[in-house]
Amino acid sequence: MGTPQATITRVKAGPAEERRNVLSAARRVFAREGWTHTTLAAVADEAGLEPEAVGHYFKDKEQLLLSVLLDGSASVAAALTVAAEEHLGEVTDLEQDLAALGRAWLTPLTAFPEHFAIVRHVGAEATRLPAGVLEMWQTAGPRQAQRELARRLQATARRGLLDIPDAGHAAGRFVQLVSGPVVQHSFHGALPLPDFETDELIAAGVADFIRLFSPGSAR
């Protein structure tokens, strides 16, 4: 008597799962090809779907890019919010804690490589992007993260460790001085820097930040 063979039944993906599949495929394609060279057909092929299936969830390439950017930006902003809370929640050594925050602020470059590949394309193709995409991305991502950083810096100032009249301005200066040079030199993570160079840039930025915002400093 033969052994009965198991029957494998494929369960069709539901709408929510299929939409996530399209977004993941689009993220990979936009990361490789950028805005100009990405097509809905290429996204459908990457997702293993018919082009009509992609069109069911996203009416055009603009809506798809915006959805991918906002989804990635939300993940990055959430990670940076956690970093600010962890490193500024209880400050014991201001310089060391700010340096640790600076390193943590850079971790999304490696944690979300496809998102930052898209960001690099966005920078290069800014003049060709649909109207409104850049503003919505900035609002959902970088500005949201800086708002949370500003809130934590203001709490640090209330403890007398910093003198910050404008928390939003201070958050912008932190990003500019501490993480900005690493982002710039590494081309948004495309060419990672040696650890010693990253540490040197962060230390220099933190020193400048403390000089600007230490109690009694002249600005």
Model regions: which residues?
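Short, flexible, glycine-rich and Lys/Arg-enriched loop motifs at helix boundaries
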Residues: G72-L94, H188-P194
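Hydrophobic/aromatic-rich alpha-helical bundle segments in the mid-to-C-terminal region
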Residues: R10, F116, E135-T139, R143, ...
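Short coil/turn segments at alpha/beta junctions that flank glycine-rich nucleotide-binding fingerprints
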Residues: R32-T36, F112, R159-G160
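Short secondary-structure transition hinges
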Residues: Q96, R103-A150, P192-D195
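Hydrophobic alpha-helical connector segments
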Residues: T81-A117, A167-F174
